[in-house]
Amino acid sequence: MRYLATLLLSLAVLITAGCGWHLRDTTQVPSTMKVMILDSGDPNGPLSRAVRNQLRLNGVELLDKETTRKDVPSLRLGKVSIAKDTASVFRNGQTAEYQMIMTVNATVLIPGSDIYPISAKVFRSFFDNPQMALAKDNEQDMIVKEMYDRAAEQLIRKLPSIRAADIRSDEEQTSTTTDTPATPARVSTTLGN
């Protein structure tokens, strides 16, 4: 019986490892991006802190922006915008619910390669109770903080796709630089009037 339990446990581990399952909130950051520079206009702002935290959770070593190393990829955080749209109204016409939309733009600079723009968009709804103004403000602050965290997660999840695009770009460059024999000019087969 013990042998059967060990066999089933081993089989379960192999199946989950083989299908690519991984723990929540972790991303397989490419090995070429395990050391990175985080560049932001507001290094102590909420987005910078959230991105820095996500990078560290995923095992990325962060270097100082003023480092002399030029062979390290750089994640540059750009503009953050938060929009608030009315989602529903009370009978008297006052806003009952808002939909908050956070848009974050960033670029990844890979030395010797290209600059890859990435963006993240996070949506959250927020109920507006006019009778609880203080609680409403606190709830909105908590929602915005959570939106920064989700946007940071989305940005980090896009790093593997940037690496794949970089590899494709390198392959296209090598295929265009190889010598190919000249092909005959295209001949039109239509009859002119």
UniProtKB/Swiss-Prot annotation:
Lipid attachment in record (S-diacylglycerol cysteine): 19
Keyword Membrane carried by entry: yes
GO cellular component entries: cell outer membrane; transporter complex
Bilayer topology annotation: Lipid-anchor
GO molecular function annotations of the record: lipopolysaccharide binding
Family annotation (HAMAP family): LPS_assembly_LptE
Keyword Signal: yes
Name of the protein in its database record: LPS-assembly lipoprotein LptE
Subcellular location: Cell outer membrane
